[in-house]
């Protein structure tokens, strides 16, 4: 019975920590760049694009395909940074909890 109470207490603590992390993540920003900084995209912690910067040299019709590729690459880089930050925060939050391998938070 004590073990169950201890697990319930840890679950409540984890829930409170997760809420705090989610609030912190909402304020996080990451910028991804591509093409030697010709394109940059900034995301917030909810993976919403907050800024896109495109070098004027890419704004030519014949450069459209290159620009599309660079935008995707910059977005993917920024998204990876956000994902890594979330993973690090989650690791620190769940330290010491007996979670199965590959278990991801938030649910």
UniProtKB/Swiss-Prot annotation:
Pfam families documented for this protein: YbaB_DNA_bd
Main location: cytoplasm
Signal peptide (residue range): none
Subcellular location as annotated: Cytoplasm, Nucleoid
Protein keywords: Cytoplasm, DNA-binding
Protein family per UniProt: Belongs to the YbaB/EbfC family.
HAMAP family associated with the record: DNA_YbaB_EbfC
Task of the protein: Binds to DNA and alters its conformation. May be involved in regulation of gene expression, nucleoid organization and DNA protection.
Protein name: Nucleoid-associated protein BT_0257
Organism: Bartonella tribocorum (strain CIP 105476 / IBS 506)
Classification of source organism: Bacteria, Pseudomonadati, Pseudomonadota, Alphaproteobacteria, Hyphomicrobiales
